[in-house]
Amino acid sequence: MESIVVSNWKMHFSFSEACNYLNLITSLHGNLNIAKVIFAVPNLYLSGLKLKFNDTYHFSAQDVSMITESSGPYTGEISASMLKNLNVNYAIVGHSERRLLFYEDANTIASKVRNCINNAIVPIVCIGEPIEARKNKTYLQYIAQQLSSISFSFTKNIIIAYEPVWSIGSCMVPTIDDIYEVVTMIREIQNRYIPHNIENSVKIVYGGSVSANNINQILTAGIDGVLIGKASLKLESLTTIIKTVQGLD
């Protein structure tokens, strides 16, 4: 199974900076298997970057509309159908920043996941507990509740990103045992919904303060790859992470 690196740029880079960054990565193409890397860039850049870099890279939207219609009077919204028209094959859904800052709830996230699936876009669904749930030992129940709202997607091609909210951007990383415990539970819950005659195509990645310094250890936690934020904005750390992940295959 190919290991995955999702590079989430968030609201960083001008368009020219984005092009320069990807050009630098292109210069390393002989040493990096780019097919395993998904760049989640600002939605505004998707069309231009895909035009400039053609099929060199996989690109992901950082969000997608919850509106089921492909078009309509919805100011500011970008439908899954619009993304698919650009040949965008991935979209991040339910990132903790959107849950917190934009009050996205389980129904909103489920709608976005369903819209992605209906348009042959692979949703990268972010789940994870706040520090309160970790401290009071209810984190497994918290995560299970998040998963219950998207259980309809478990027979589809999706990526689940486990990102403890308290770990994102904090330099605090769960222990390997902690990550493995959650990953194991996720797989157990998935298996309840997947018939025996259907192959499990769900991949699980870890996100939350992933860096070049801890990637080797994180990869021992039974995951299929990583979702990285800040560390993916610097070429040296990103290439180190990619090379390390490649070593698994």
Curated annotation (Swiss-Prot):
GO terms for biological process: gluconeogenesis; glyceraldehyde-3-phosphate biosynthetic process; glycerol catabolic process; glycolytic process. It catalyses: D-glyceraldehyde 3-phosphate = dihydroxyacetone phosphate. GO terms for molecular function: triose-phosphate isomerase activity. SUPFAM superfamilies: Triosephosphate isomerase (TIM). InterPro entries: Aldolase_TIM (IPR013785), TIM_sf (IPR035990), TrioseP_Isoase_bac/euk (IPR022896), Triosephosphate_isomerase (IPR000652). Pfam families: TIM. Involved in the gluconeogenesis. Catalyzes stereospecifically the conversion of dihydroxyacetone phosphate (DHAP) to D-glyceraldehyde-3-phosphate (G3P). Belongs to the triosephosphate isomerase family. This is Triosephosphate isomerase. It comes from Orientia tsutsugamushi (strain Boryong).
